[in-house]
Amino acid sequence: MAGQFCLPVSPRLSPLKPLKPHFGDIQVGIYVAIQRSDKRMHLAVVTEINRENSWVTVEWVEKAVKKGKKIDLETILLLNPSLDSAEDPMPVSPLAPAPSSAIGDQSTTTKRVVMIPQKNKTASGDSLDVRVPSKPCLMKQKKSPCLQEIEKVQKQREKRRRLQQEIRARRALDVNTRNPNYEIMHMIEEYRRHLDSSKISVLEPRQEHRICVCVRKRPLNQRETTLKDLDIITVPSDNVVMVHESKQKVDLTRYLENQTFCFDHAFDDKASNELVYQFTAQPLVESIFRKGMATCFAYGQTGSGKTYTMGGDFAGRAQDHSKGIYALVAQDVFLLLRNSIYEKLDLKVYGTFFEIYGGKVYDLLNWKKKLQVLEDGNQQIQVVGLQEQEVCCVEEVLNLVELGNSCRTSRQTSVNAHSSRSHAVFQIILKSGGKLHGKFSLVDLAGNERGADTTKASRKRQLEGAEINKSLLALKECILALGQNKPHTPFRASKLTQVLRDSFIGRNSSTCMIATISPGMTSCENTLNTLRYANRVKELNADGRPYHRGLYPNGHEASRMLKSHIGNSEMSLQRDEFIKIPCVQSEEQQKEIEDVERATLLGKDTTTSRKGSSQWLENIQERTGGVNHDVDFCIAQSLSILEQKIGVLTEIQKKLKLLRADLHVKSKVE
């Protein structure tokens, strides 16, 4: 490999063409010191200068292989400080010689030294002994753009982590870390903060039901506040209740499961008894003046506020009955008695108060005398021996309520120190001429309990809870049977349902249910059970069918409706045959007859298809009931029959659509 040499530049030689100031003395063809990625340093020849991007291309020969790289201007000037200024260059210590095959004789006698390579010769990178200048600048290698971007992302990540740590620290200062449920509390608060009540309020349209179902949430009591219990109930609108149930994953991570329930009315913990009464029992008061049977009952867990809602505020064990639903109903009853419309009826008001405890009925106004519930010849339920006292004002009604509550059975439970253990029924009866005119039953149900909550209780307490749950279950079954139009309604399953029978099946009966719930997280299971119970009660709608059924009937209901329609059509046809009309039938009458005939044919097709389907199912069951039946043959035969049935049903569907379209057109013309 040819050597290279350095010649001193004399003043007589023409100076080199000056470069731009920021490039210094860097020119194409000079030798510069470079640093490799493995920290080796050697000489290389400058072959190209890019002034726009401020980088320099250098080349060298290493092991008979020509190599090159691009180096930015800053790195070149750091490794070669003598090239930084063209006007006053600093003296440079001689670099270590390049390999003998590439470097010739050098002379450093003059101040200014310019290294000029021989023509078509390139510096060698085989030698590793290249000394750094005697007074070097800071040997700082510029980082690649990729590395710079990585460092930038890392700095942003560290900044975000610092901010998150600061946020966690601030949150830790805001909450009481001694509360074990502060994480759940923050989840609930965050959920409520981002809750859009405008979207939730229209989750389910309000429908008219035979039972008005309302839910009332009570505030946290002193015991729950002392135990740092959380409020997991949210009432975002006037008919929606949300339960934030705390769950735990397999990795012990806690999360919320939010369950939503829709009712006729929902009241939060700030609602007063007057507000609850305005939307629950007050609309039913006037019905008893029209010979109606009204019922309002409170249902819920022990200690959820049933007696508070029905009876009034508590001050210790003393209760202010003037603010309960009992008193509010009595006030409206006596106000309506003075109305000119009902004043002519000469009505008298009576009050009764009895309890149902352990499957037996006791009169609370007659020192808890045991009573019998019997059915008379008119299939009306009568409580034999029940004392009825005439009342003339609200004060007398409150005296009866106070007397009855003083005799009512109560026990201490794990939730409440003074808990009612019986179903209390207070009735306001209107009589005209000694006969029943109307009745309003106000029922304060005993609190439902789970068996798991009474494991440490006495046997008597457990029997009490079992009897209470039995009667509440019977009440729900009766409501469901009425909602599904079952032929039998189990009213005789408990004394409670026997007493309330006329409130459900009477001609002018109207009922309202107030479900009271506890907001604490420890009562979450009981709260969900109460809401599910109330949700099932809501299914008893105005027409006797559950509201969640489809708009169009199916199955046997569809065939029954079609049969009735066909029967009416046939009767009308027979009637028209016997009536002799002297004139010719009009076009409208002719169209009506054609519509009836089409409906009759459709009914016959449907009946034939249904009979064929039932016969086919019986044949399949007989074949498959044998031991040696052919499975493949049965499957093939079933598929062929199904195809035929599908074709018939499709044809019936087309005819029904055409008939419906004709009826719509006819109604528009009329």
Swiss-Prot record:
Signal peptide: none annotated. It holds the Pfam family KIF2A-like_1st. GO terms for biological process: cell division; metaphase chromosome alignment; microtubule depolymerization; microtubule-based movement; regulation of chromosome segregation. Keywords: ATP-binding, Cell cycle, Cell division, Centromere, Chromosome, Coiled coil, Cytoplasm, Cytoskeleton, Kinetochore, Microtubule, Mitosis, Motor protein, Nucleotide-binding, Phosphoprotein. The modification Phosphoserine is found at S201. Phosphorylation at Thr-122 by PLK1 is required for activity in the correction of kinetochore-microtubules attachment errors, while phosphorylation at Ser-201 also by PLK1 is required for the kinetochore localization and activity in prometaphase. ATP binds at G300, Q301, T302, G303, S304, G305, K306, T307. Residues 210-540 form the Kinesin motor domain. Residues 146-173 form a coiled coil. One of its GO terms (molecular function) is microtubule binding. GO terms for cellular component: centrosome; cytoplasm; kinetochore; microtubule; spindle. InterPro entries: KIF2A-like_N, Kinesin-like_fam, Kinesin_motor_CS, Kinesin_motor_dom, Kinesin_motor_dom_sf, P-loop_NTPase. The modification Phosphothreonine is found at T122. It comes from the Eukaryota. It is found in: Cytoplasm, Cytoskeleton, Microtubule organizing center, Centrosome; Cytoplasm, Cytoskeleton, Spindle; Chromosome, Centromere, Kinetochore. Belongs to the TRAFAC class myosin-kinesin ATPase superfamily. Kinesin family. MCAK/KIF2 subfamily. Plus end-directed microtubule-dependent motor required for spindle assembly and chromosome movement during mitosis. Has microtubule depolymerization activity. Plays a role in chromosome congression. This is Kinesin-like protein KIF2B. It comes from Macaca fascicularis (Crab-eating macaque). The gene is KIF2B.
